[in-house]
Amino acid sequence: MGCKLKVCFFKPESDLNPVAVERYEANILGCTRQFRYSTANTNTIDMALSVNGIPVVALELKNQFTGQDYICAINQYKNDRSSKEFAFHLNHRFLVYFAVDLYEVWMTTQLADSNTRFLPFNQGSNGAGVTGGAGNPQNPNGYATSYLWEEVLQRDSLLDLIHRFISFVKEKEEVVKNGVSRMVTKEKMIFPRYHQYDVVRKLMADVRRNGAGKNYLIQHSAGSGKSNSIAWTAYRLASVHDADGNGLFDSVIVVTNRVVLDSQLSLIHISEPTRLRCISY
């Protein structure tokens, strides 16, 4: 037996329900320096962000002026942050772990000691949505990585990420051992890469501003997560409202040759009163 508690209230699509707006504004977001995560040692994470007292984002911060960079932070996660700690168990506390220096941001959603896999969370050398190389553009007004705390981890954005992007999924996968094949269930947390976060939010902002009827061309390279971007966009379009609180779309139809999209839509579970299903012809 158990009792389900709602520990966070998310931003409603419109202001028509004042109670929903009040509950959203009552969320308490915190920032803790040198966050102690264990009762077995005195190790700390440089910074932890919490929502209503629950730690959800971990950041290890390094800077080149002291001879350290994001690689040092990644090694710290791999070697000094035991995956056996309760706070680091998948889907228990932290949802994402960032390794940050003055020029680059990398992230992972699951600590697995030396097997931890980090991915870049950078804008690209010429900025978001502009063709370029790896890394981030120079920032004349601050650090090259300041977009992380000035934009991505800003209050509304962080709650939006938790609400509409981050997903805990279970996938069946075939494993062959000693010539014997069997299906196993693997769990993982899905967190958008920066280009996915950026394109979905830009699309939604333009739709709210201009309504239906516009065409958009989105450039995605191979292996960049097109299916997830489509799924996130489809779910959000199904519930988007204009400035007057009116729903913009009655239905969302996705036409694609990506046969995996049906499973992607099922995996990207968003806590919205919408249901999407793929149909084939």
Regions found by a protein language model. Give the residues of each.
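Conserved H-loop
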Residues: 257
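ATP-dependent helicase/translocase motor core
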Residues: 1-251, 260, 264-271
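Single conserved hydrophobic/aromatic residue that forms the stacking wall/gate
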Residues: 268-281
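Conserved SAM-binding loop
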Residues: 254
